[in-house]
Design a protein with these regions (language model features):
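N-terminal pre-ligand scaffold of iron-sulfur
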Residues: 3-73, 100-117
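Short cysteine/histidine-rich metal-coordination sites, predominantly Zn2+-binding motifs
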Residues: 74-81, 92-102
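Short, acidic, Ser/Thr-enriched surface-loop or helix-capping motifs
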Residues: 87-88
């Protein structure tokens, strides 16, 4: 399955700073996403909505494949077995073979920055 409209960054080429800063708030528009790496190297994807920000690790809970955001369907989809997760419902599995939601990454807005919470 080709993921037309999927995020182009596979592993998140932006790392979290030592002070837990992920990205300046102005760099992620409402409705946008931002790909980054956690301090342990795990890939993650941040979402910004009208009401705030949230993020998930993007390693599939089935067999560890990479889940990429498929914007037209508003789902994170694993490239290995097409497991699908709804980022707007706490990373809930909407199509198997995965049976666990994606791990939540706690984030917050602090001043002009999106940070690890």
């Amino acid at each position: 399955m080709a993921l037309v409209g999927a995020s182009t960054s596979l592993l998140g080429n932006h790392a979290v700073a030592a002070n837990n800063q992920i990205v300046n708030l102005s760099k992620v528009k409402v409705g946008g996403t931002y790909s980054f790496q956690l301090k342990n190297g795990a890939p993650a994807l941040l979402f910004r909505t009208k009401t705030g920000v949230f993020a998930y690790q993007t390693i599939c809970t089935h067999e560890g494949g990479l889940a990429k955001y498929f914007a037209p369907r508003k789902l994170l989809v694993c490239a290995v077995h097409n497991a699908s997760f709804d980022p707007f419902k706490k990373g809930k599995v909407v199509a198997g073979p995965a049976n666990k939601p994606l791990p939540i990454v706690k984030v917050a807005i602090k001043g002009e920055w999106i940070v690890l919470a």
